[in-house]
A protein has these predicted regions:
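Preference for protein termini
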Residues: 1-32, 36-41, 60, 64-69, ...
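Short beta->alpha connector loops
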Residues: 6-12, 76, 124-128, 190
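Helix N-cap/beta->alpha junction signal
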Residues: 9-10, 29, 74, 104, ...
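Alpha-helix capping/helix-boundary segments
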Residues: 12, 32, 76-77, 173
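Short glycine-/acidic-enriched loop or helix-start segments at secondary-structure transitions
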Residues: 15-16, 36, 80-83, 163-165
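Conserved N-proximal alpha/beta basic substrate-recognition cap immediately N-terminal to
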Residues: 39-125, 129-132, 136
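Conserved A3 ("GATE") glycine/threonine-rich loop of ANL adenylate-forming enzymes
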Residues: 102-105, 159-163
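Conserved ATP-binding module of the ATP-grasp superfamily
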Residues: 117-119, 140-154, 163-190
């Protein structure tokens, strides 16, 4: 089992890590320190409110501790997890992928709060994920056998603008997506 860093404070997440017998460390603001000390919870203090010239320090600290992966507990720590995991896993693309997911979800939440309809979205790692998402979206829309599918949009993470954007209506169309366009973001059509 891997050694995980929980980014942010959630007693439920700590209890879950313990119940799964996971080695973990909580990375949270200073206000969590006293509670962590009183309850023997492994803890590293960190202020997530803004990026600064010490931002690389937390990734290096966790790497030196032997942490395998950082897990964001809140939307606000997704970007941090992407940056930290890009160091821990030696994969610079993870930061960009985390930023895309965070930006997209923030944008959707703000639009929804403003009364704008938004589609559902999810990350796909392979063609099977895309087919499952297409079927799930159309089952949710109560499509009957023989009804044409509502399309979904698939967008490669590492492509800019409209490059790598595809509109998929049938499972057969998924075969046309090249392997290098994974992972990708899928979204229901409005």
């Amino acid at each position: 089992k891997g050694y995980i860093a929980l980014l942010g404070w959630s007693l439920n997440a700590v209890e879950a890590a313990e119940s799964f017998d996971r080695r973990y460390v909580v990375v949270a603001p200073d206000w969590a320190e006293e509670y962590c000390q009183q309850h023997d919870i492994p803890y590293v203090p960190w202020n997530f409110e803004r990026l600064n010239d010490r931002s690389m320090e937390i990734a290096e600290t966790l790497k030196e501790m032997g942490v395998d992966v950082a897990i964001p507990l809140f939307e606000e720590t997704v970007e941090w997890a992407g940056a930290i995991n890009s160091v821990l896993l030696d994969n610079p693309r993870l930061l960009g992928q985390a930023m895309l997911m965070r930006d997209k979800s923030l944008m959707k939440r703000r639009a929804q709060l403003g009364g704008i309809r938004v589609g559902i979205f999810e990350e796909a790692h392979d063609r099977d994920d895309i087919i499952r998402f297409l079927k799930r979206v159309n089952q949710t829309l109560l499509k009957l056998d023989g009804d044409p599918n509502d399309p979904i949009h698939v967008k490669a993470f590492d492509k800019a603008g409209c490059l790598g954007h595809r509109v998929i209506r049938t499972p057969d169309e998924v075969d046309s997506i090249p392997d290098e366009e994974s992972p990708s973001l899928m979204e229901s059509h409005l």
